């Protein structure tokens, strides 16, 4: 079974999981930073400029990740516009500025002879500071990414333990807001 993404040449999720397992088997006391990111408004890029340009944005971001993060890093495309990375043998404190710079650096796609900017959002977490098991690391980084998306995109955020409760309550508020705006003939049932 393939372990690389055919479009970007990065690891796919299977390859990523295998590499991470190999790294962690060697040293359970290692510190690492997990990153989860995606391209802001990627559907708009595909709809506005076409899938060829969307693919170019994905390839560009993959190349940026490979050149920006060190050879010790494990980088993958999860699918769609989602990417994950594990920065091995480092801490959040050591990499915070580098992650911020990576997130905020300008990125462009070319369409009809013009350059058009595109942006990313990124969440990150540290093992073992933010989670007890490295398998939780990307989930924590994903919650941090979700928090960035809730507050305007094109930014990055470290994981905070409060994100778990905020994520749950945010989903509840969204359902409540939707139900308030429905005509009287609609009923919402919540299955237990």
For the regions a protein language model found, what residue spans apply to each?
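Conserved nucleotide-binding and Mg2+-coordinating catalytic segments in signaling enzymes
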Residues: 1-18, 37-51, 59
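Catalytic-core segments of nucleotide cyclases and related cyclic-nucleotide turnover enzymes
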Residues: 51, 96, 127-157, 166-175
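Short helix/loop segment flanking the catalytic signature motif in cyclic-nucleotide metabolism enzymes
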Residues: 57, 84-102
């Amino acid at each position: 079974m393939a372990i690389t993404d055919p479009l970007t040449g990065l690891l796919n999720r299977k390859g990523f999981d295998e590499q991470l397992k190999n790294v962690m088997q060697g040293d359970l006391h290692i510190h690492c930073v997990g990153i989860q990111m995606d391209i802001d408004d990627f559907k708009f890029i595909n709809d506005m400029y076409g899938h060829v340009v969307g693919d170019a944005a994905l390839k560009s971001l993959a190349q940026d990740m490979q050149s920006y993060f060190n050879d010790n890093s494990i980088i993958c495309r999860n699918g769609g516009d989602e990417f994950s990375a594990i920065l091995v043998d480092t801490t959040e404190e050591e990499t915070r500025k580098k992650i911020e710079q990576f997130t905020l650096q300008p990125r462009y796609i070319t369409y009809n002879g013009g350059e058009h900017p595109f942006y990313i959002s990124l969440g990150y977490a540290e093992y073992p500071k933010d989670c007890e098991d490295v398998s939780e690391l990307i989930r924590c980084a994903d919650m941090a990414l979700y928090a960035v998306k809730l507050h305007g995109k094109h930014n990055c955020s470290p994981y905070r333990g409060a994100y778990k409760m905020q994520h749950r309550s945010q989903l509840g508020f969204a359902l409540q807001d939707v139900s308030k705006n429905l005509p009287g003939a609609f009923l919402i049932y919540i299955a237990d």
